[in-house]
Structures are given as C-alpha cells and as structure tokens.
Amino acid sequence: MQPLEVTLKRYLFRLINGFRSGTQYSPSQLPIDSFSRILIIRQHDQLGDLLIATPTLRAVRRKFPNAFIAVVVREYTASVVENNPYVDEIIVFYEKLWRWNIRKLILFWKMLRNDFGCTIVLNTISRSLSSDIIALLSGSKYIVGPDHLMLDPSLPEKIYNVPIRWPSVQKHEIQCNLDIVRALGADENDFEYDLVLTDGEVNEAERIYQSLGIPPGKTVVGVHFGALNPSKCFPLEKLVTVIDWMIEKFNVEIVLIISRNEIERRKIVLSTVHHKLHSAPVMPLRIMAAFLRHMSLVLCNDTGTLHITASQRVPTISFHSLSDPVIWKPPHPRHIAVRANDWLITSITIEQVQEAVITAMKQFVEKPAS
C-alpha cells in the first residue's frame, strides 16, 4: 500500500474504533447452531483469489446446510460465483464510484441489511478497509476475521469481534482461507475450485471450439500469455520457441487464448512462430472457462487464467515470479509451476519449460511421439 493510503486507512480505523464496542468473543462462545443467515465477504482481490476461496464457501455450506449464505464480491469477479451451489445470493460491490447509482445503492443496502447473524471476512494477505466497512454495515452481531492484519497495532481490534488466531507456519492460500472458518467448525479436505457452468455456456464454447477447425483426435494445448503486470509475463520470444518445439516433438495443436488486452501480443506471437496456430476469439470469462475444457494442457502466466483453468480440472504449466507458487499455485498435482531461483520471470529458461512440458505430457496427457 502507498503511504497516503496507509495513513487514510489508519485514520478511518481509529475513527471506527472510537464508536465501536470492544467486546470480543471466542469461537466457543458463538451460538453457532442459531446461525441461519451468514454473510461472507471476499470482494477486494482478483479472480484467482476468489476461486481460491471457493473451497471455503463449500466448507461453510456443509457446516450450515440449511443456512442462507450470501457472498459479497466485486463486479468483475461476480461471474466466478454465479451458479455456485453453495451460495444463495451474490451481493455486488462496485469498486468504481461512477458505477454506482441510487438504484444500486438501495439494492446493495437492502441485500446487506438482511438479518445476518454472522459475517465472515476472508482477509488473508492484506486488510481491506472496504470489506471491514461492509461487515460493519451488515449489522451482524458477530464479525469473524483473522487477527494478524491490524492497521494500527497500538489499538485493540474492534471490527472483528471474533478474531481468529493466525497460524505462524506458511500455508497455501486455500488453507489460510479455511483457517478462518475452521474456528466455526467448518472444514474441507477437497481443494478443487468451484466454477459451475451452465449448459448454454458449455454449448457456446463447443460452437467456438468447432469453428477453429481442429482435426478430431488431436492433442490440443492452450497458451495464454497475458498478465496486467509485466513482471508476471513470460517473455514472448521464449514462449514462441517452446510453442514450435511442442508442435515438432508432440504433434500437438496450439490454441492461443487471449483477453482484449492481449490482441497486440498475439500479433507478435503469430508473426514470429514457425508453425500454424489456432486463435480463439476474446470470450467472456465463463465461456472461456467452458472453452478451456477442450484443452489437454494449458500454458499460462500466474494470473486468473491459471485458476480458471484449474477450476475445469485441466492440467497447467504456469510461469511464476514474485508470487510463491507454494502459496498461490493450484495445489493439485496436475498443475506444474515453473520459477527461476532469482524469482524473475525473465530468468525462467526454455529448458525449464520444456522439462515441465515433458513431465505434463507423460503424466497427464500422452506419451511423446518417437
């Protein structure tokens, strides 16, 4: 966070503390059996962060099978939890001020003030003041959150009146989210993500895939090369070398998968690669998720696309820089992370990627051609 942002958040935190009771509850003091309406807030992060939290949504539902469960998310991540069987209602928080109007404000307030007995704030890496304010505005008597993200350590914690002790050992982000609700007796051993698609979305993705003219029976590898942060983008010249090598060694069909921000980068790939590639059109998130089901393997950077692909149980090879894959990579064995020792994306070698491809093809796809 920038210094000005930190100062502002600390000021607001102090202001809130001045008006809120300091009464705290341990998880054992909670009337858990009476929680018939539960609010879960995970609105301050990116697509991948929300998908990582879906096992926690599943855990809460299984602990409270008859409860009404609502989740607060950002507008651009809301489609991740559409059709989720463990969520009854999606409450959208608009990040941009200009996206709000009177009708949206009234609806947001009405949905938020819905007699929630317990609010759970899934803060893990950083503390979101907007999430804290939403939790307070919900009117819940009990607000559950981690105890390690104090904006001002000199003040007592008054927003999370059910503070959950944070573990001192390093864990995967899925485990970190689950730790917050384990105190309520909710747990989950299945770490697969939930992104549940409709038949219409699957059919539209099928139509798009068929339009590419890929011969039946061929092994199809998807390649997504974008990221908003340039430090997370595997160099295109190295990626092109890997693509040509994969086609020659494994006789695969390569499909380039892009967003609107990656059209120019796709032109660079197509102008430098030595083999014919297929290009998928820009697709909405959920259609893209359905489209990814047609891939035998996906190569991508450490972005939301990695986690979207994982949600459809498709093997991946992902390129990582500053974010530790031990913490952030989908934890399932079918996902292989590639990272340089100096954590620089530009230091990842072609040989590292080729080794990962060979492993993935042997273990999850098919044996290499002789």
Task: Map each language-model feature to its residues.
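Catalytic machinery of carbohydrate-active enzymes
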Residues: 1-370
